[in-house]
Amino acid sequence: LLLGVFGFARPATNGVDAGSKAVVVLAIDVSLSMSAVDVEPSRIEVAKDAALRFVAKAPNNTLIGVVAFDSNARQIIAATDNKAAISRVVTALQPGTGTAIGEAIYAALDTISSAVDPSGDTKNAGTIILLSDGTTTTGRPDTEAAAEAQSLGVKINTIAFGTQDGTVTTPDGQVVPVPPDEQALSNIADVARGKSFTAATAKDLQAI
């Protein structure tokens, strides 16, 4: 599953906490569009399951942080090797509204920075795995944030969830299409020297 992503997610570890531990931040989209059920049982549930599998299979010398984002981005848990605690916060994630991918990247960079030994080399110290379905609707531009990550030597690997047939019902009862913006996520990965994937089905995700 996500260990395919992890295979190229391992950063250089100069200066990170505990010397030999890699730092990976899972940035998980919890916007309303992630509640679409074109990927069964829903985009967000498939993304959460992918994150949980990643956590379970990650090597023990990995510090994992979690950032969740809708119209705001926030660190849900600082980078840690406590897999049970990480799994609890991922399981509890629920969808909101809005999509602030740029803000999520900045929050993930802050999470990496906080896990790095200040006496060491902070360059190339972490990797971000961005699980989302698409387009930034609020906050700072995602390409600007990706460029900041690139300048710090932090790779961003992206996974786009959903199909062109995805829809959601808004709070006022309107059914609106929510196709994934695969190109936007690919652009982020390109700028930050990562790789991008698309998961139109849960089976697709297992092939990553």
For each feature predicted by the language model, list its residue ranges:
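VWA/integrin I-like adhesion module and closely mimicked acidic/polar interface patches used
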Residues: 99, 103-106, 118-127, 132-191
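Soluble periplasmic/extracytoplasmic beta-strand elements of cell-envelope proteins
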Residues: 23-33, 45, 50, 63-69, ...
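Extended, hydrophilic extramembrane loops/domains of integral membrane proteins
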Residues: 181-208
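An amphipathic, basic-hydrophobic helix/alpha-beta surface used to engage anionic
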Residues: 1-56
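Solvent-exposed, acidic/flexible segments
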Residues: 20, 40, 44-48, 57, ...
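Solvent-exposed loop/turn segments at secondary-structure junctions
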Residues: 32-33, 71-74, 83, 95-97, ...
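Sec-exported extracytoplasmic/periplasmic mature domains
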Residues: 32, 52-63, 91-95, 109-117, ...
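Short beta-strand-loop
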Residues: 18, 40, 63-92, 106-119, ...
